[in-house]
Protein backbone atom coordinates (compact mmCIF):
# COMPACT_ATOMS: atom_id res chain seq x y z
CA UNK A 1 0.00 0.00 0.00
CA UNK A 2 2.72 2.50 1.01
CA UNK A 3 4.65 2.07 -2.24
CA UNK A 4 1.53 2.54 -4.36
CA UNK A 5 0.39 5.60 -2.41
CA UNK A 6 3.85 7.19 -2.70
CA UNK A 7 3.71 6.59 -6.46
CA UNK A 8 0.28 8.21 -6.69
CA UNK A 9 1.42 11.23 -4.71
CA UNK A 10 4.44 11.71 -6.96
CA UNK A 11 2.23 11.32 -10.03
CA UNK A 12 -0.09 14.12 -9.02
CA UNK A 13 2.79 16.37 -7.91
CA UNK A 14 4.57 16.12 -11.25
CA UNK A 15 1.37 16.33 -13.30
CA UNK A 16 0.01 19.39 -11.49
CA UNK A 17 1.80 21.45 -8.84
CA UNK A 18 5.26 20.13 -9.53
CA UNK A 19 5.49 21.89 -12.86
CA UNK A 20 4.49 25.50 -12.19
CA UNK A 21 3.15 27.00 -15.45
CA UNK A 22 5.27 29.85 -16.79
CA UNK A 23 2.96 30.64 -19.68
CA UNK A 24 -0.78 30.53 -20.27
CA UNK A 25 -2.16 29.84 -23.73
CA UNK A 26 -5.75 30.98 -24.12
CA UNK A 27 -8.02 29.81 -26.90
CA UNK A 28 -8.29 32.29 -29.75
CA UNK A 29 -12.03 31.66 -30.21
CA UNK A 30 -11.50 30.34 -33.74
CA UNK A 31 -13.26 27.01 -33.15
CA UNK A 32 -12.37 24.21 -35.53
CA UNK A 33 -13.69 20.66 -35.83
CA UNK A 34 -11.25 18.05 -37.09
CA UNK A 35 -11.81 14.36 -37.84
CA UNK A 36 -8.56 12.50 -37.28
CA UNK A 37 -7.97 9.00 -38.71
CA UNK A 38 -6.77 6.61 -36.02
CA UNK A 39 -5.79 2.96 -36.00
CA UNK A 40 -7.13 0.35 -33.58
CA UNK A 41 -6.66 1.18 -29.90
CA UNK A 42 -7.80 -0.18 -26.53
CA UNK A 43 -6.21 2.41 -24.25
CA UNK A 44 -6.82 6.14 -23.82
CA UNK A 45 -4.11 8.42 -22.43
CA UNK A 46 -5.22 12.02 -21.94
CA UNK A 47 -3.33 15.07 -20.75
CA UNK A 48 -4.32 18.69 -20.65
CA UNK A 49 -6.67 21.28 -19.23
CA UNK A 50 -10.34 21.93 -19.92
CA UNK A 51 -10.79 18.82 -22.05
CA UNK A 52 -14.18 17.05 -22.22
CA UNK A 53 -14.04 13.55 -23.67
CA UNK A 54 -17.08 11.60 -24.83
CA UNK A 55 -16.22 7.95 -25.43
CA UNK A 56 -18.38 5.15 -26.85
CA UNK A 57 -17.57 1.47 -27.15
CA UNK A 58 -18.97 0.22 -30.46
CA UNK A 59 -18.32 -2.22 -33.29
CA UNK A 60 -17.78 0.49 -35.89
CA UNK A 61 -14.22 1.42 -36.91
CA UNK A 62 -12.26 3.58 -34.49
CA UNK A 63 -12.93 7.29 -34.77
CA UNK A 64 -11.69 10.56 -33.29
CA UNK A 65 -13.19 14.05 -33.58
CA UNK A 66 -11.64 17.14 -32.00
CA UNK A 67 -13.44 20.44 -31.54
CA UNK A 68 -11.40 23.25 -30.05
CA UNK A 69 -9.65 26.55 -30.73
CA UNK A 70 -7.36 26.49 -33.75
CA UNK A 71 -4.36 27.73 -31.75
CA UNK A 72 -4.93 25.04 -29.11
CA UNK A 73 -5.38 22.29 -31.70
CA UNK A 74 -2.07 23.18 -33.33
CA UNK A 75 -0.22 22.69 -30.05
CA UNK A 76 -1.58 19.20 -29.35
CA UNK A 77 -0.76 15.81 -30.81
CA UNK A 78 -3.20 12.99 -31.49
CA UNK A 79 -1.74 9.59 -32.31
CA UNK A 80 -1.91 5.88 -31.62
CA UNK A 81 1.19 4.09 -30.30
CA UNK A 82 1.13 0.44 -29.25
CA UNK A 83 -2.68 0.43 -29.26
CA UNK A 84 -2.74 3.56 -27.05
CA UNK A 85 -4.57 6.65 -28.27
CA UNK A 86 -2.61 9.57 -26.85
CA UNK A 87 -4.05 13.08 -26.71
CA UNK A 88 -1.58 15.49 -25.17
CA UNK A 89 0.32 18.73 -25.76
CA UNK A 90 3.26 18.56 -28.11
CA UNK A 91 6.57 17.97 -26.37
CA UNK A 92 7.60 21.62 -26.19
CA UNK A 93 4.33 22.50 -24.39
CA UNK A 94 4.12 19.65 -21.87
CA UNK A 95 5.88 21.53 -19.10
CA UNK A 96 5.35 25.03 -17.76
CA UNK A 97 2.29 25.62 -19.96
CA UNK A 98 -1.29 26.18 -18.85
CA UNK A 99 -3.95 25.77 -21.56
CA UNK A 100 -7.26 27.64 -21.35
CA UNK A 101 -9.33 26.64 -24.37
CA UNK A 102 -12.65 28.27 -25.20
CA UNK A 103 -13.82 24.69 -25.52
CA UNK A 104 -12.07 21.37 -26.03
CA UNK A 105 -14.43 18.57 -27.01
CA UNK A 106 -13.14 15.10 -27.88
CA UNK A 107 -15.44 12.44 -29.36
CA UNK A 108 -13.91 8.97 -29.60
CA UNK A 109 -14.95 5.37 -30.10
CA UNK A 110 -13.29 1.97 -30.29
CA UNK A 111 -14.23 -1.69 -30.25
CA UNK A 112 -12.41 -2.34 -26.98
CA UNK A 113 -11.17 -0.30 -24.06
CA UNK A 114 -9.15 -1.74 -21.20
CA UNK A 115 -7.30 1.27 -19.82
CA UNK A 116 -8.06 4.96 -19.32
CA UNK A 117 -5.56 7.43 -17.87
CA UNK A 118 -6.21 11.15 -17.53
CA UNK A 119 -3.94 13.88 -16.13
CA UNK A 120 -5.03 17.44 -15.48
CA UNK A 121 -8.59 18.75 -15.44
CA UNK A 122 -9.98 16.34 -18.03
CA UNK A 123 -13.63 15.21 -17.78
CA UNK A 124 -14.23 11.80 -19.37
CA UNK A 125 -17.73 10.53 -20.10
CA UNK A 126 -18.24 6.86 -20.98
CA UNK A 127 -21.56 7.13 -22.79
CA UNK A 128 -22.21 3.50 -23.72
CA UNK A 129 -22.21 0.13 -21.98
CA UNK A 130 -18.61 -0.92 -21.40
CA UNK A 131 -17.33 -4.48 -21.17
CA UNK A 132 -13.82 -5.80 -20.56
CA UNK A 133 -12.07 -8.57 -18.69
CA UNK A 134 -9.59 -6.19 -17.09
CA UNK A 135 -10.09 -2.43 -16.84
CA UNK A 136 -7.85 0.24 -15.34
CA UNK A 137 -8.93 3.82 -14.65
CA UNK A 138 -6.33 6.35 -13.53
CA UNK A 139 -6.69 10.02 -12.60
CA UNK A 140 -3.99 12.52 -11.66
CA UNK A 141 -5.20 16.04 -10.91
CA UNK A 142 -8.76 17.34 -10.75
CA UNK A 143 -10.34 15.31 -13.53
CA UNK A 144 -13.51 13.22 -13.58
CA UNK A 145 -14.24 9.79 -15.04
CA UNK A 146 -17.94 9.05 -15.25
CA UNK A 147 -19.68 5.90 -16.48
CA UNK A 148 -23.15 6.86 -17.71
CA UNK A 149 -24.21 3.30 -18.53
CA UNK A 150 -23.58 -0.27 -17.41
CA UNK A 151 -19.93 -1.27 -16.89
CA UNK A 152 -19.09 -4.98 -16.59
CA UNK A 153 -15.63 -6.32 -15.77
CA UNK A 154 -13.91 -9.28 -14.22
CA UNK A 155 -11.35 -6.99 -12.57
CA UNK A 156 -11.60 -3.22 -12.14
CA UNK A 157 -8.69 -1.12 -10.90
CA UNK A 158 -9.11 2.55 -9.96
CA UNK A 159 -6.20 4.84 -9.05
CA UNK A 160 -6.75 8.50 -8.15
CA UNK A 161 -4.18 11.07 -7.04
CA UNK A 162 -5.32 14.62 -6.31
CA UNK A 163 -8.90 15.88 -6.21
CA UNK A 164 -10.38 13.84 -9.05
CA UNK A 165 -13.61 11.83 -8.99
CA UNK A 166 -14.68 8.44 -10.34
CA UNK A 167 -18.43 7.88 -10.77
CA UNK A 168 -20.10 4.63 -11.83
CA UNK A 169 -23.67 3.89 -10.77
CA UNK A 170 -23.97 0.58 -12.65
CA UNK A 171 -20.68 -1.23 -12.07
CA UNK A 172 -20.60 -5.03 -12.04
CA UNK A 173 -17.32 -6.85 -11.41
CA UNK A 174 -15.83 -9.80 -9.57
CA UNK A 175 -12.91 -7.88 -8.09
CA UNK A 176 -12.39 -4.16 -7.55
CA UNK A 177 -9.26 -2.42 -6.32
CA UNK A 178 -9.23 1.28 -5.51
CA UNK A 179 -6.14 3.29 -4.50
CA UNK A 180 -6.71 6.91 -3.50
CA UNK A 181 -4.25 9.64 -2.49
CA UNK A 182 -5.57 13.13 -1.78
CA UNK A 183 -9.09 14.51 -1.39
CA UNK A 184 -10.85 12.55 -4.11
CA UNK A 185 -14.11 10.62 -4.38
CA UNK A 186 -15.27 7.28 -5.74
CA UNK A 187 -19.03 6.86 -6.20
CA UNK A 188 -20.27 3.34 -6.93
CA UNK A 189 -23.50 1.50 -7.53
CA UNK A 190 -24.04 -2.05 -8.76
CA UNK A 191 -22.57 -5.34 -7.56
CA UNK A 192 -18.98 -6.28 -6.64
CA UNK A 193 -17.62 -9.60 -5.42
CA UNK A 194 -14.48 -8.54 -3.54
CA UNK A 195 -13.67 -4.84 -3.08
CA UNK A 196 -10.35 -3.53 -1.78
CA UNK A 197 -9.66 0.14 -1.05
CA UNK A 198 -6.54 1.97 0.12
CA UNK A 199 -6.98 5.61 1.11
CA UNK A 200 -4.21 8.04 2.05
CA UNK A 201 -5.59 11.46 2.93
CA UNK A 202 -9.21 12.54 2.91
CA UNK A 203 -10.55 10.40 0.09
CA UNK A 204 -14.16 9.25 0.15
CA UNK A 205 -15.90 6.14 -1.16
CA UNK A 206 -19.69 6.47 -1.52
CA UNK A 207 -20.99 2.97 -2.21
CA UNK A 208 -24.17 2.33 -0.23
CA UNK A 209 -25.77 1.58 -3.62
CA UNK A 210 -23.12 -1.03 -4.40
CA UNK A 211 -23.58 -4.50 -2.93
CA UNK A 212 -20.23 -6.07 -2.02
CA UNK A 213 -19.70 -9.65 -0.94
CA UNK A 214 -16.45 -8.74 0.81
CA UNK A 215 -14.83 -5.41 1.71
CA UNK A 216 -11.18 -4.99 2.62
CA UNK A 217 -9.87 -1.50 3.29
CA UNK A 218 -6.96 0.47 4.71
CA UNK A 219 -7.34 4.12 5.63
CA UNK A 220 -4.49 6.44 6.63
CA UNK A 221 -5.83 9.88 7.49
CA UNK A 222 -9.41 11.12 7.48
CA UNK A 223 -10.79 9.06 4.62
CA UNK A 224 -14.34 7.71 4.68
CA UNK A 225 -15.92 4.60 3.19
CA UNK A 226 -19.64 3.88 2.88
CA UNK A 227 -20.61 0.44 1.56
CA UNK A 228 -23.24 -2.28 1.59
CA UNK A 229 -21.56 -5.55 2.57
CA UNK A 230 -22.97 -9.08 2.62
CA UNK A 231 -20.37 -11.39 4.18
CA UNK A 232 -17.03 -9.96 5.32
CA UNK A 233 -15.32 -6.74 6.34
CA UNK A 234 -11.61 -6.38 7.05
CA UNK A 235 -10.69 -2.81 7.92
CA UNK A 236 -7.58 -1.03 9.16
CA UNK A 237 -7.72 2.63 10.13
CA UNK A 238 -4.87 4.91 11.21
CA UNK A 239 -6.20 8.36 12.02
CA UNK A 240 -9.73 9.73 12.04
CA UNK A 241 -11.12 7.80 9.10
CA UNK A 242 -14.37 5.87 9.17
CA UNK A 243 -16.09 2.87 7.64
CA UNK A 244 -19.88 2.92 7.61
CA UNK A 245 -21.65 -0.15 6.33
CA UNK A 246 -25.10 -1.49 5.64
CA UNK A 247 -25.92 -5.19 5.73
CA UNK A 248 -25.21 -8.03 8.16
CA UNK A 249 -21.70 -9.37 7.50
CA UNK A 250 -20.86 -12.11 10.00
CA UNK A 251 -17.08 -11.81 9.64
CA UNK A 252 -15.81 -8.41 10.77
CA UNK A 253 -12.09 -7.90 11.38
CA UNK A 254 -10.96 -4.45 12.45
CA UNK A 255 -7.85 -2.64 13.61
CA UNK A 256 -8.09 1.01 14.60
CA UNK A 257 -5.28 3.34 15.65
CA UNK A 258 -6.54 6.82 16.50
CA UNK A 259 -10.08 8.16 16.55
CA UNK A 260 -11.30 6.21 13.53
CA UNK A 261 -14.46 4.15 13.68
CA UNK A 262 -16.23 1.27 12.01
CA UNK A 263 -19.98 1.26 12.42
CA UNK A 264 -23.18 -0.17 11.02
CA UNK A 265 -25.83 2.25 9.78
CA UNK A 266 -29.42 1.73 8.76
Description of each model-found segment:
Residues 1-266:
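Intrinsically disordered, low-complexity terminal regions
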Amino acid sequence: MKTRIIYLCLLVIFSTTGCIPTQTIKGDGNITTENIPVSEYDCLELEGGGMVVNYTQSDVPEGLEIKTDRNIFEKYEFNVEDHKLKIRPKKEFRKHTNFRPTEFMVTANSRNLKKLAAAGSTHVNINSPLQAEEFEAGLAGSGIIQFHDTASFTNLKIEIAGSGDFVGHKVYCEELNGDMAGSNTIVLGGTVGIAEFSIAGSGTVRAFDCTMDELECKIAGSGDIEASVVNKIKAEIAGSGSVKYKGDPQDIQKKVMGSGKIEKVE
